[in-house]
């Protein structure tokens, strides 16, 4: 039983050792000459302007959650499409109900104005 997982365990151990070894090796032989310029925050070659603690509009989060919600349907549609012939009419009706529920949710979100960007 353990023999089946041995290659994966060896791969994980080698990857962890390589990562840790690289970090330790670079910290030992790397140059350590900190300066004000090197320690300053860097953003795309420009001097940072303003605070990094700005608030985002809640609309970004709402759109992100709606995207995730309606994108997850693909996770359920793909296995159904693969097994469509084996599921037959029962699978078709179940997926029809699923799509109708998603469509009703989409209409609800649309009517509430969550997709409006003002």
UniProtKB/Swiss-Prot annotation:
One of its GO terms (molecular function) is quinone binding. It is found in: Cell inner membrane. It is a multi-pass membrane protein. The chain crosses the membrane at residues 5-25, 62-82, 87-107. Its EC number is 7.1.1.-. Keywords: Cell inner membrane, Cell membrane, Membrane, NAD, Quinone, Translocase, Transmembrane, Transmembrane helix, Transport, Ubiquinone. The keyword Nucleotidyltransferase does not apply. NDH-1 shuttles electrons from NADH, via FMN and iron-sulfur (Fe-S) centers, to quinones in the respiratory chain. The immediate electron acceptor for the enzyme in this species is believed to be ubiquinone. Couples the redox reaction to proton translocation (for every two electrons transferred, four hydrogen ions are translocated across the cytoplasmic membrane), and thus conserves the redox energy in a proton gradient. Belongs to the complex I subunit 3 family. This is NADH-quinone oxidoreductase subunit A 2. It comes from Geotalea uraniireducens (strain Rf4) (Geobacter uraniireducens). The gene is nuoA2.
């Amino acid at each position: 039983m353990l023999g089946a997982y041995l290659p994966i365990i060896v791969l994980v151990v080698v990857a962890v050792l390589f990562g840790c070894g690289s970090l330790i090796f670079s910290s030992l032989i790397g140059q350590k000459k900190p300066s004000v310029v090197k320690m300053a925050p860097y953003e795309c070659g420009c001097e940072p302007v303003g605070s990094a603690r700005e608030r985002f509009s809640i609309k970004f989060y709402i759109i992100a959650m709606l995207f995730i919600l309606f994108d997850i349907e693909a996770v359920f549609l793909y296995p159904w499409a693969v097994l469509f012939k084996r599921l037959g009419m029962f699978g078709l009706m179940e997926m029809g109900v699923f799509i109708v529920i998603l469509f009703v949710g989409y209409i609800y979100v649309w009517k509430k104005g969550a997709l409006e960007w003002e």
